[in-house]
Design a protein with these regions (language model features):
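Non-catalytic terminal accessory/regulatory regions of metabolic enzymes
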Residues: 1-93
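Catalytic beta/alpha-barrel core
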Residues: 6, 138, 154-165, 175-188, ...
Length: 344
């Protein structure tokens, strides 16, 4: 059962609902949103008198297994990263090198991606690599470099966290925590990120269904963190021509099933620099709320994923195209009701 409370609901109403759940030995999870509203997910049904208190605005008895992530009880969520809003109607571009290579190199990249149109800086301080011999990142030193780049450019920072024990330290430096595809079902990490005050970027696993992806988000939400952004980053397929297959079907479907913002990673999703721009535009056309793109001043010299990394000039071109597609879609939404003879 999902119970939605209005922003002005009395504190006593929440207490009554939780007490009713406890009396029936039902587990209840409360998720508070920045606007003051709240959602309570209960593992069972409550009696009618527990749901008639002031401020109860909606009750759902039938719902998806991902109670808190489900769209049924809430409109589009907007997640704030620094001063940037994801899901607020304007596509957001996160960009930067795959891995932090050094302070000066990162600041150069940060300045370049900001000039190109990015509003959030990405960069890995801790890198999960397929080979144990590959560069694993600079660790806390890399986090310090990211914080320095934020100070210089004003861009908020998103970076990956690999283990539950790293969450607090990474949260000290970063504005947003990223949970990568390999860790999508690392449940201790999901729970720990759910207890953080930082927003979380949750990438879809290589072989995960959309429902499994949303259930992973539910782990974070169930711990009290409402600020989750989903990221489609490509799934495994049979064609060796691509590193992964970017599953753009998942974008409108995830937005249909969930209120959480959805962004797309066309860099990992294709593995090919030449396809990043085209798939970025396609992602926005499919309804994505933003993009996360690997960009480097000199991709050929990048320490990680150079073959899928673009230049700042290419990023600027992508940002222009993304804006054009967004404007076209907004115009289409305005004229569609008129063409159909409906009231606007």
């Amino acid at each position: 059962m999902i119970i939605t409370l209005a922003a002005d609901a009395p504190v006593s109403t929440l207490g009554h609902v939780l007490a009713a759940a406890a009396s029936l030995r039902l587990e209840a999870r409360t998720l508070r949103y920045p606007d003051g509203s709240a959602v309570i997910g209960v593992d069972g049904a409550l009696p009618g008198d527990a749901l008639t208190h002031p401020g109860v605005v909606n009750v759902l008895s039938k719902h998806k297994p991902y109670m808190l992530a489900a769209r049924a009880h809430r409109g589009n969520s907007v997640v704030r990263v620094g001063e940037v809003e994801i899901g607020g109607g304007t596509p957001v571009v996160m960009a930067g090198p795959c891995v932090v290579e050094g302070r000066d190199e990162l600041i150069e990249a940060a300045r370049a991606v900001k000039a190109a149109g990015a509003t959030i800086l990405r960069g890995g301080a801790y890198k999960p690599r397929t080979s144990p011999y590959a560069f694993q990142g600079l660790g806390e030193l890399g986090l310090q470099h990211l914080a320095d780049a934020r100070t210089v450019t004003g861009l908020p920072v998103v970076t990956e966290v690999l283990e539950p024990e790293q969450v607090d330290m990474v949260a000290e430096y970063a504005d947003m925590l990223q949970i990568g595809a390999r860790n999508m079902q690392n449940y201790p990490l999901l729970r720990r990120a759910g207890k953080s005050s930082r927003p979380v970027l949750l990438k879809r696993g290589f072989s995960a269904t959309v429902e499994e992806w949303l259930m992973a988000a539910e782990y974070i939400l169930s711990q009290g963190n409402p600020n989750v952004v989903l990221c489609e980053r490509g799934i495994r397929a049979f064609d060796p021509a691509f590193r992964f297959n970017l599953d753009l079907n998942a974008v409108p479907l995830a937005k249909e099933l969930s209120h959480l913002p959805v962004i797309v990673d066309p860099s990992h999703g294709t593995g090919l620099r030449s396809l990043v721009g085209k798939m970025s535009v396609a992602a926005i056309a499919a309804g994505a709320d933003g993009l996360i793109i690997e960009a480097h001043p000199n991709p050929e010299r990048a320490k990680c994923d150079g073959q899928q990394t673009i230049t700042p000039a290419d990023l600027a071109a992508i940002c222009r195209r993304v804006d054009a597609v967004h404007q076209a879609l907004a115009y289409e939404e305005q004229i569609a009701p008129v063409e159909l003879g409906l009231a606007v």
